[in-house]
Curated annotation (Swiss-Prot):
<keyword id="KW-0285">Flavoprotein</keyword>
<dbReference type="InterPro" id="IPR036188">
    <property type="entry name" value="FAD/NAD-bd_sf"/>
</dbReference>
<dbReference type="GO" id="GO:0050660">
    <property type="term" value="F:flavin adenine dinucleotide binding"/>
</dbReference>
<dbReference type="Pfam" id="PF01134">
    <property type="entry name" value="GIDA"/>
</dbReference>
<dbReference type="GO" id="GO:0030488">
    <property type="term" value="P:tRNA methylation"/>
</dbReference>
<keyword id="KW-0819">tRNA processing</keyword>
<dbReference type="GO" id="GO:0002098">
    <property type="term" value="P:tRNA wobble uridine modification"/>
</dbReference>
<keyword id="KW-0808">Transferase</keyword>
<comment type="similarity">
    <text>Belongs to the MnmG family. TrmFO subfamily.</text>
</comment>
<keyword id="KW-0521">NADP</keyword>
<dbReference type="InterPro" id="IPR002218">
    <property type="entry name" value="MnmG-rel"/>
</dbReference>
<dbReference type="InterPro" id="IPR004417">
    <property type="entry name" value="TrmFO"/>
</dbReference>
<protein>
    <recommendedName>
        <fullName>Methylenetetrahydrofolate--tRNA-(uracil-5-)-methyltransferase TrmFO</fullName>
        <ecNumber>2.1.1.74</ecNumber>
    </recommendedName>
</protein>
<dbReference type="InterPro" id="IPR020595">
    <property type="entry name" value="MnmG-rel_CS"/>
</dbReference>
<dbReference type="GO" id="GO:0047151">
    <property type="term" value="F:tRNA (uracil(54)-C5)-methyltransferase activity, 5,10-methylenetetrahydrofolate-dependent"/>
</dbReference>
<feature type="binding site">
    <location>
        <begin position="14"/>
        <end position="19"/>
    </location>
    <ligand>
        <name>FAD</name>
    </ligand>
</feature>
<comment type="function">
    <text>Catalyzes the folate-dependent formation of 5-methyl-uridine at position 54 (M-5-U54) in all tRNAs.</text>
</comment>
């Protein structure tokens, strides 16, 4: 690390996981940083301490398996990149089987101590109530899901009021190769061709009356998660949880997101479905499909059991389950460029959960990328995005362009927060053992190993450019 004290500092707003990691990466590159954190001057309903990188929910960073789990691959890539968050997590690990879990107090204290001790990092405890003044120059905004209202309003004013969401409405996402296409079929309603569409842009899952009634009953009876007190109840038109719609009457769903009109079962064209669940392509690769209109507060265990009742989804593998939470985040695919800069004001860069990633590790990873991109620019170097074959690149791609933006559901935005998962990675050729054809679970594991090996090799090559 060489110090460039003659450089003007980079300002980072928000001392959570992403902001802490961004500040560390910038300082480690030799560029001075001012890290602004509003706690303890102003607290939140979720934070309990004034430590940086406080973990407000679980103490788990999820699987540490870097061979067959996408988040484990992201762990490995972050370690290769010199991540502060991963170093402190490893130093404060507690037993959790194959997962990386941490002593939450020890972890956040360690992050705080490392940042406070760094000669190029200045920590300012103050609330930033608006967008940074132009004289600050390059600034990273990493204010997280609980962004203070005044700053959120300023961001909304800069980006357009519709560009900032205050609650996520997450519908489950399914891996395409787990959908039974002997039951389901491709068709848009009334064969309508939308922008960039073919008239066959949805996968349709048909139900007869008996299946529909059993499904509605299961939705109503399923275990549900209550809102936390500070979240309020953010139901609004176009974003009702699927189980709340079911409770409004037995016919509500089949006249709403499950309406069968304009659809003909390609496998049985003479029999009209009583109801239809539609799945819409979620990423440009075509590896992921989301369940249209299926945002939910059902507990995860209930979701998997109930949604596998849907014909064609009996063996569905979920890349993400549904939810509805308090969460401030940008419509990033529209607003941010491929190195996380605001297109309309390129001195502003965003990082962490406010960009639309989901999870501790993912937020930290986007902070790491934002920090590296910013440091490169300050040092008059090129900010080179990671390859899409890496976990870094797959996650960045979802945020800045891999997600397909649609406008066909009034009251909803199609871009929703996402954890890293193998469905975000470009497909890979799976090596076949000589004279043997892989099937089932064996094939799935081989595919994951191939994706992981490619990701780590490509990540090492990318890091060698910096």
């Amino acid at each position: 690390m060489s110090n460039n004290t003659d450089l003007s500092p980079v300002h980072v707003i928000g001392g959570g996981l992403a902001g802490s990691e961004a500040a560390w990466q910038i300082a480690q590159a030799g560029v001075p940083v001012v890290l602004h954190e509003m706690r303890p001057v102003r607290g939140t309903d979720a934070h309990k301490t004034e430590q940086l990188a406080e973990l407000v929910c679980s103490n788990s960073f999820r699987s540490d398996d870097a061979e067959t789990n996408a988040v484990g691959v992201l762990h490995a890539e972050m370690r290769l990149a010199g991540s502060l968050i991963m170093a402190c997590a490893d130093a404060h690990q507690v037993p959790a089987g194959g997962a990386l879990a941490v002593d939450r107090e020890g972890f956040s204290q360690a992050v705080t101590a490392r940042l406070e001790a760094h000669p190029l990092i200045t920590i300012e405890r103050e609330e930033i109530t608006g967008l940074p003044p132009t004289e600050w120059g390059t600034t990273i905004i990493a204010t997280g899901p609980l962004t203070a209202p005044s700053l959120a309003e300023a961001i909304a004013a800069e980006t357009d009021a519709d560009a900032l969401a205050f609650f996520d409405a997450i519908a489950p996402i399914i891996h395409f190769d787990s959908i039974n296409m002997d039951v389901c079929w491709f068709q848009s309603r009334y064969d309508k061709v939308g922008p960039g569409g073919t008239g066959k842009d949805y996968i349709n899952c048909p139900m007869d009356k008996e299946q529909y009634e059993a499904f509605v009953a299961a939705l109503i009876e399923g275990d549900k998660t209550d809102f936390k007190e500070w979240e309020g109840t953010p139901y609004f038109d176009g974003c009702l949880p699927i189980e709340v719609m079911a409770e409004r009457g037995p016919e509500t769903l089949r006249h709403g997101p499950m309406k069968p009109m304009g659809l003909t079962n390609a496998h049985n064209p003479t029999v009209k479905p009583y109801a239809v669940v539609q799945l819409r392509q979620d990423n440009a690769l075509g590896t992921l499909y989301n369940m249209v209109g299926f945002q939910t507060k059902l507990k995860y265990g209930s979701q998997t059991g109930i949604f596998k009742m849907i014909p064609g989804l009996e063996n569905a593998e979920f890349a993400r389950l549904g939810g509805l939470h308090r969460n401030t985040y940008l419509n990033s695919p529209v607003l941010l460029d491929n190195v996380l800069r605001l297109k309309s004001r390129q001195t502003l860069r965003f990082a962490g959960q406010v960009t639309g990633c989901e999870g501790y590790v993912e937020s930290s990873a986007i902070g790491l990328l934002a920090g590296r991109f910013t440091a490169a620019e300050k040092l008059s170097q090129a900010a080179v995005p990671p390859p899409p074959t890496t976990a870094f690149g797959a996650l960045l791609g979802h945020i800045t362009g891999g997600h397909i933006v649609t406008n066909d559901e009034p009251g909803k935005r199609s871009f929703q927060p996402m954890n890293v998962n193998f469905g975000l990675f470009p497909p890979v050729d799976v090596p076949k053992p000589e004279g043997k054809r892989l099937r089932g679970k064996e094939k799935t594991i081989a595919k994951k190993r191939a994706l992981s090996a490619r990701a780590l090799a490509d990540c090492r090559n990318w890091l060698s450019l910096y």
